[in-house]
Amino acid sequence: MGSQLVTWDSSTKGAGVTLDSSKLTFTITTDSVKSTIGKTYGKWYCECTINSGSNGAMIGIADSTVSMTGTLFASPKVYVYYQVSGGLYSNNQGPAYGSSYGVNDTISILLDLDNKKLEFWKNGVSQGVSNAN
């Protein structure tokens, strides 16, 4: 099985997202962006590092039907790890989950679609396993 380069998708990004020429790095003021390749089964890993910015980032996964503008965490088809509180938000609910994160932190996502498990990591430390329907 070969590797696959997945980048940020310029066709689905919100207006407040600027991608660099590689589509591997973005600057965001509002809205969101998805990757170029969605997944429906298997086990997947990705990570991102916060280089700069304010305290409003939400990193996570979303169904392909979810728009990348507006309030994402209100959708039941989105799971995001919120920078300020460390909460795991979906469907307007944000229970306590992990620790907050900021500049120079690396957030990893482990997604097991076969077993409906989602896990976020901060700088190599698991923040806990969640069920992701």
Task: Kindly give the residue locations of the regions a language model identified.
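PRY/SPRY (B30.2) beta-sandwich protein-interaction domains
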Residues: 1-133
